[in-house]
């Protein structure tokens, strides 16, 4: 999906990936949000998919764990950031990367993609070892990026 993202909506390159730290990881989320703002992406429903190490950087940021607020206390208790910079943060070990480096952290909105599914070639038959009738069919599905301007990518490597 990151291949569909326009060049203007990318931070970093595969040749020169960004190396975030606990002090600036949140700022990169803000920068992704600004790119989506400039592309007229709706604010409600934004998401970002981050690898575990990037999620860990956010957990080390004082802004998320400073005590005194209910959200910070919750972050300390369960280790989940949840939301930041207008994004719902999704942690995944399946973030596209090149041999453990150059992670492509994807941010966007659900309006950027579409999903379709259909059951075709439906047939009834009689199972060999059972009494009665059964149905079988071919389930086809697929997804496609239809509004690439509503996606943004941060290409980052671990420090």
Set out the residue ranges of the language-model regions.
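Hydrophobic, aromatic-enriched interface-forming segments
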Residues: 22-63
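Long, contiguous amphipathic alpha-helices that act as assembly "spine/axial" helices in icosahedral shell
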Residues: 1-14, 37-52, 89, 120, ...
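Alpha-helical scaffold segments that mediate packing/assembly in large oligomeric complexes
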Residues: 1-38, 155-159
């Amino acid at each position: 999906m990151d291949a569909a993202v326009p060049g203007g909506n990318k931070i970093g390159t595969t040749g020169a990936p960004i190396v975030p730290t606990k002090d600036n990881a949140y700022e990169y989320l803000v920068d992704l949000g600004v790119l989506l703002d400039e592309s007229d992406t709706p604010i409600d429903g934004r998401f970002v998919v981050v690898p575990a190490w990037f999620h860990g950087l956010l957990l080390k940021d004082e802004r998320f764990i400073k005590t005194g607020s209910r959200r910070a206390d919750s972050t300390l208790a369960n280790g989940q950031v949840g939301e930041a910079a207008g994004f719902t943060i999704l942690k995944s070990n399946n973030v596209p990367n090149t041999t453990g480096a150059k992670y492509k952290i994807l941010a966007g909105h659900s309006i950027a993609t579409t999903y379709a599914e259909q059951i075709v070639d439906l047939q009834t038959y009689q199972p060999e070892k059972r009494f009665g009738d059964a149905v079988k069919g071919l389930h086809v599905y697929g997804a496609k990026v239809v509004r690439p301007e509503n996606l943004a990518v941060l290409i980052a490597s671990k420090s």
